[in-house]
């Protein structure tokens, strides 16, 4: 009888992920304009964008997947897209040790 596989979580310290996210938001606020518009943002569309950014790359720095100039709403949707991709095991979020840089790669990319 087969046993149900336990969900696999990213091998990243949550505190470091939060710190990296806070750094990205801080940079976004430096280039923030005050034009307010209503914009529909698709998580699925941003999932595709993240996957395209990772194609052909062994690893990408976590910060490289975000463009602070696009504003906080796009950054938030991109983060949600990245976490959804990790949940669906399409990407891996890794960190060598505490306080080390965080990297993202396609889950099916050979490590070596």
Tell where the protein language model's regions lie, with residue ranges:
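Long, charge-dense, low-complexity tracts
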Residues: 1-112
């Amino acid at each position: 009888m087969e046993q149900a596989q336990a969900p696999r979580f990213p091998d990243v310290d949550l505190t470091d992920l939060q710190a990296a996210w806070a750094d990205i938001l801080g940079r976004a606020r430096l280039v923030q304009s005050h034009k307010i518009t209503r914009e529909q943002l698709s998580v699925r569309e941003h999932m595709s964008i993240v996957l395209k950014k990772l194609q052909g790359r062994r690893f990408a720095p976590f910060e490289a997947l975000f463009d602070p100039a696009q504003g906080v709403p796009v950054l938030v949707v991109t983060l949600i897209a990245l976490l959804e991709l990790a949940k669906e095991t399409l990407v891996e979020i890794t960190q060598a040790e505490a306080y080390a840089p965080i990297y993202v790669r396609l889950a099916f990319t050979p490590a070596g």
